[in-house]
Amino acid sequence: MNKLLLHLVRVISILGLANALTQTQPILKDIQITDSYTKTKECTDPDHWFIIEGQLSIPKGSQQNITFQVPDAFSSFPQEPFSIKHNSNSVATISRPDKSTNNFTISIPEKSSEDITTTFNFLAQLTSDAKSKVTEPKSIVYSFYSENTMFNDVIDYVAKNTSAITTDGGIYKTNNTAWFTVDLPMRTFRNPVYLTSQTSSSSDYVFDTSLTKFEVVTAVDSFNEPINAIPYTTVHDYSTEDEIRCLFNSTISGGLYFRVTYFTKKLSTSSISNTVELTYPDEGTSVRLLGKRDTSTTLASELYSESAANIDSTTSDDTTSSDAAITPTYSNSTLSSYTSQSSAIPEVAVTASLSSGILSSTVDGASTSADASMSAVSTVSSSSEQASSSSISLSAPSSSNSTFTTPSSSLSATETYSIISSASISVTQASYIDNSTTTAVTQSTSTIAVSSAEKLSSTLSYTSNVTISVSSATQHTTTPSYVSNSTTLSSSSVLESVISSPYLANTTVSGASSASQSTNPPYVSNSTTSSATQLATIAPFAINITGTSISSSITNTSSVSSTTSSLSSGPFVSNTTVASGSYILTTTTESAQLTEIGSLIPISTITTSTTTSGTDKTGSNKVASSTEIAQSIVNNSSLSVSTINTNAATAAANARNATFTHATHSGSLQPSYHSSSLLSSTIDTKVTTATTSTSRDGSSSLAFTTGLNQSVVTGTDKSDTYSVISSTESAQVTEYDSLLPISTLKPTVVTGTSRNSTFSMVSSTKLTEATATDKGDAYSVISSTQSAQVTEYGSMLPISTLETPTVIMSTDESGYFTLTTCTESGQATEYGSLIPISTLDGSVIYTFTGESVVVGYSTTVGAAQYAQHTSLVPVSTIKGSKTSLSTEESVVAGYSTTVGAAQYAQHTSLVPVSTIKGSKTSLSTEESVVAGYSTTVDSAQYAEHTNLVAIDTLKTSTFQKATATEVCVTCTALSSPHSATLDAGTTISLPTSSSTSLSTIITWYSSSTIKPPSISTYSGAAGQLTIRIGSLLLGLISFLL
């Protein structure tokens, strides 16, 4: 802090108070400001809350109001009025009458019977404009005014001390969760150390351990905040919801400092406190603490989500400071092992080097590092006396050849090689006893040679052309997370060799005299394994695997039918889904008014990006690749979608006529697919049919066939559970649960000639009766009508849409499936379902009522027959509707199909439907019924919405599909009764009972839009009528009344 500047402003403040001391009215003696997190005048983060503290003097008998002004750089003040207390009694209040200014008024409600001097405080934050001016460390003077008196105070904005242990934290306003950081200097990790963070006794919150991050900071800004960091994974994390607890027992080097970031779940209070403790285990005493002056056992912190008044005193206390520069202390016995931290380097050769810095390890185990930026040749060698806990970190971003060699002395500790982005690096370790871990990250060509080792573990995070040579080792484990092209892993004399690779290509594993060797690649292409006494291969997705000299009796194989795949060349289009939190959903009606709906269900926004080359991304995702014939192969992989480019295309192309083998160590067959993708397409209202065959082991195969045209194949990865509410016209509510929300995907178009897909699943079918389920919860559904009005319905029970029992087909739950539907307009909607779609081709449902037929995802076949599918998407009832062909009203429907004279079957979908102004249904034009995600022809338009709440209450547009069955008891032409299906789409009336007079039936038949045979003669006495079709006289038909 600039002490001279502070003294000057204090002198000015004292001179200003000289007059005030002689007055009898209340006065402010002082106003100061401190950082609420550090409890000092030093601030390492401008986002911190600041404590404004004033000292008030109230003379005996005084009751006058006074004012004071806070600098315009501050805002976010507490709710006023708030009290000023003395001995727990309120003696005054503070308010801000004009909220547009920073002028405060202190009001004294009663005259005091004695002289009172007390303090008050409240929280404030810098405004956005004030924060933008703090771009580098500086000291800023803030001036407060009260009754012609100025009080000045200084805040020093300083960079954090990277050589000390520091903490930081805050509370997000968006979701009311807290974050914490602990920054540790690299020397903290000379010995194993525990980091523990807990809530204080006055706070009640839990940690979200899934979000904890560990990073090595390699570049910082002017405040020493990270601008570049590398993730670090070698941490023993024992954290729970109640505490963060981590053990670091590895040497960490190569960065400026180490950062631990962790988070809480949603908070229930506006302020919390936290403690951080560091301990060294196994150092003679039961607990070895890192503390300031060896007196502080914890680092405490207070966080606030909103402003408050009268918080704890801001008096600085050295023994409880939470953000001070706390230097790790060590006993003399500990320091003895680090007395020699550098030594002469026996051999250093640097040629054509712009910058080169090399530090060799010592006898006591200090680290060896090399930075050979832009060098052509770099050589580092260490002496043969190197003994314990050595670490070699190599950084050669642009070097051509770098060689690092350690001699063949007997070692007993861990050797760590970190090789980053080099053209050619060779690391040779002659001999050691315990173990060695070799890590090669993002490099082109590397050679790692070990002549003798008891245990060797090689981890290759992202490599190409890496050679690991082991002459003699008891156990050799190689784990390349992503290895491609010409990778050779060899060992001449290894007792046990294990190769574990989620993604390998062109890999050769050879062992001249290996007692045991196993390969576990979930995705392997073109692999060869030879010369192993016992070989175990587990490859859920393997192509062209060759094994020689194998002696094993524990391999079982199961296979599924091959698929023919073909991918066109070009960039791979991937989709990214962002979904979190609470959303406000806005929909538009025909008159351009907006209806706003609040929803707790996230709405997924799918953005399309084109990737032409692979990226270094890992994680557990589903990788979907589409083929020319609209098939989809889904595999679980450690690679995100964006990394599947030409390699994935090549692998898919190589899958032609291949057998997928799943080898296990048990005697029973296991399925090769743990997850499947179910693909269905609808183009030009063509029918999708399915055939099901069940094998002896209970599995079923579904074959789907559709017509010709383009299709869209894409997929997303969702795993949460949401509740979907749908409403019907009669103001009833039905709730449905779905494992996946609806995602609207922008298209990836694949051109093909046909779509024939076969999928395998374990399922069994059974006939069940559709029933209604009572639910005890209350729901409120808001839907918009065609006239831009909003109707809200509330109901305690869901709807039962059928008056008579209807037999439908359902399937048992049998694992996880993904359903993707496509439209001709190149958009796709994906549904997640536990129940696969099962198609009943040609099934017919009739109701002899005034209501329409209720079906789920129906398509038209022949004479208005229905193919019904069971689905997680509910179906609406269209009650009492009729067809109007003379108006110009828009037809609004969800997933509608047209049959006959512009009749349609309406379905309630998880994707809403928008009203398109000006569209109409006309039999004399080629315009189609406008619907959400519908197939469009000629001049028809369509609209796209992403919405989880269906809008299906229509005010003026009503339609009816009623199917009646009339049975002829006596027929002349037939020897047995038959049924005639008649279309009563636009009728005058509908016969309601068998006692209806025949004249009524004649009138009804004559008015039918399908123009049934005309009735020219009717004889009531004889019970006969004459039927003509054109000029053809069919004769007399007798009937019974």
Swiss-Prot record:
Coiled-coil intervals: none
GPI-anchor amidated glycine lipid modification positions: G1020
BP-aspect Gene Ontology terms: septum digestion after cytokinesis
Residues covered by region (Disordered): 388-410
InterPro entries: CST_Regulator (IPR053273)
Cellular location(s): Secreted, Cell wall; Membrane
Keyword Cell division in annotation: yes
Recorded GO CC terms: cell septum; cellular bud; cellular bud scar; extracellular region; fungal-type cell wall; fungal-type vacuole; side of membrane
Protein name: Protein EGT2
Primary gene name: EGT2
